[in-house]
Design a protein with these regions (language model features):
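Cytoplasmic membrane-interface "Motif A"-like loop-to-helix N-cap segments
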Residues: 64-76, 292-304
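C-terminal ends and interior cores of transmembrane alpha-helices
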Residues: 28, 76-95, 304-321
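Helix-to-loop junctions at the C-terminal end of transmembrane segments
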Residues: 55-67, 283-295
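C-terminal transmembrane helical hairpin of 12-TM major facilitator-type secondary transporters
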Residues: 296-344
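Extracytoplasmic gate region of multi-pass secondary transporters
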Residues: 15-16, 227-279, 373-377
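Multi-pass alpha-helical transporter architecture, strongest
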Residues: 192-199, 400-422
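Extracellular/periplasmic helix-loop-helix junction of adjacent transmembrane segments
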Residues: 18-51
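Glycine-rich segments within core transmembrane alpha-helices of 12-TM secondary carriers
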Residues: 135-160, 366-377
Length: 422
């Protein structure tokens, strides 16, 4: 959980800055604010394009040399890229070189995170006791809300003491304060490396090595023998990603925008920090339900709830009637649902694949879903709300949730599977 918390902290630090900082410091200042925001989101989405590549690279080594060593590499890749973002010059200083360097670092972040999640999930699932695999696997999932809490909490502290006005680039926060969360990641990475070096390799992988079942080319093998689970896992995961980046990144940009809800940035960060506790609470609940009621039935019910949630966007977020109270309710409900759908995924996706390609297969499904769900969600939602209104964003979530529901209904129940036999 420590490693995934650090990885997600690094990722969310960028996501927050993509809304409040980068449109003004890394893209031409004469742009329309919406254009600058869309450009920032485009760079934001670049990491998601890198994530499947990261899952292929790190998945190869994870299935060949082991889960432990590969996770050290993924953490270093993410940590170094995040630290370097904190040192980048701005557009005003070096022109077009600034967004180019930002995009490169964001790409490297994506590579690191692409190899992180599946390795952490496998460490949990391949060491869990019988009947408690989803419960064990939910611990790495807690890294997502804890990383988000740390990233946004630090931004909140900085904004409180240094000040921030949306669009203002002269204040202390926009001049140098925004760099602090990126630079501090180096300390967290050192802690994460200490933890990772003390880990033991999973018994399931050791057994695969002893029996000579390692794949020589995991990427080739997974597409040859497990292409159906690849497709299924991708669509099972896609609504989870879409929901999360709608109720975090997109809603932050919409909430603080003058042509949106015009809530002060500091106030909106507070609302997000309160709501994240619903995410933390619902992940263990989902893990318990997935072990007792089954993965499939749990995910079907949560998907139906997510579809219903899509119909509430207009009620909670319409500019004419929305208040901070209604936004807090929206965020809290959205985060609670997010935990319910995200919690079982670290058990479900690895259970779809055999041991010799499990790192590669689960990683590809998880990270291709990040392109189809997370990478485009803020961009699509921003375009939809500007043309059709906030209700269209809810319809977008509904459509994606239906696609995931179909995939979940097609999958087999996996809670009784033996990880050494599949």
């Amino acid at each position: 959980m420590v490693g995934t918390t650090i990885e997600f902290y690094d990722f969310y630090v960028y996501a927050t800055a993509a809304v409040a900082v980068f449109p003004y410091l890394f893209f031409p200042k004469n742009n329309d604010p919406t254009v600058g925001l869309l450009a920032s989101f485009a760079a934001f989405g670049l990491a998601f394009a890198a994530r499947p590549l990261g899952s292929i690279i790190f998945g190869h080594f994870g299935d060949r040399i082991g889960r432990k060593a590969t996770l050290v590499g993924s953490l270093l890749t993410m940590g170094i890229a995040t630290f370097l973002i904190g040192l980048l010059p701005t557009y005003a200083q070096v022109g077009i070189v600034a967004p180019a360097l930002l995009a490169l670092m964001r790409f490297c972040q994506g590579l690191g995170l692409g190899g992180e999640w599946s390795g952490a999930a496998l460490l949990a699932t391949e060491t869990a006791s019988k009947g408690k695999r989803a419960w064990a696997a939910m611990w790495p999932q807690l890294g997502a809300p804890l990383g988000f809490l740390a990233a946004n909490g630090l931004f909140l502290i900085l904004v409180t003491f240094l000040g921030h006005t949306n669009g203002e680039i002269e204040g202390a926060f926009m001049t140098w304060g925004w760099r602090i969360p990126f630079l501090l990641s180096s300390v967290m990475v050192i802690v994460g490396l200490y933890v990772r070096f003390r880990l033991e390799e999973t018994p399931v992988f050791k057994k695969a090595v002893e029996s000579g079942k390692k794949a020589k080319m995991p990427l080739t093998e997974v597409f040859r023998t497990s292409w159906r689970p690849l497709i299924l896992g991708t669509f099972i995961m896609v609504s989870c990603y879409t929901l999360f980046y709608l109720v975090t990144t997109w809603v932050l940009s919409y909430g603080i925008a003058k042509n949106g809800l015009a809530i002060p940035y500091l106030d909106f960060l507070k609302l997000q920090l309160i709501s994240i506790f619903a995410f933390i609470i619902s992940i263990p609940l989902a893990g318990r339900l997935a072990d007792t009621r089954g993965r499939k039935s749990t995910l079907i019910v949560v998907s139906l709830v997510m579809i219903a949630f899509g119909f509430t966007f207009t009620h909670f977020l319409s500019p004419g009637s929305a208040s901070e109270d209604s936004v807090l309710i929206f965020l809290t409900v959205g985060m609670f649902i997010m935990g319910l759908i995200f919690g079982p995924m670290s058990a479900v996706l690895p259970e779809l694949f055999p041991t010799n390609v499990r790192y590669t297969g689960s990683g590809i499904s998880y990270n291709v879903a990040s392109i189809l769900g997370a990478a485009i969600a803020p961009f699509v939602a921003t375009a939809l709300v500007s043309k059709y209104g906030v209700g269209a964003v809810g319809m977008y979530l509904i459509v994606v949730s239906v696609l995931s529901l179909i995939a979940i209904m097609v999958m087999k129940e996996t809670k009784h599977f033996d990880m050494t036999d599949i």
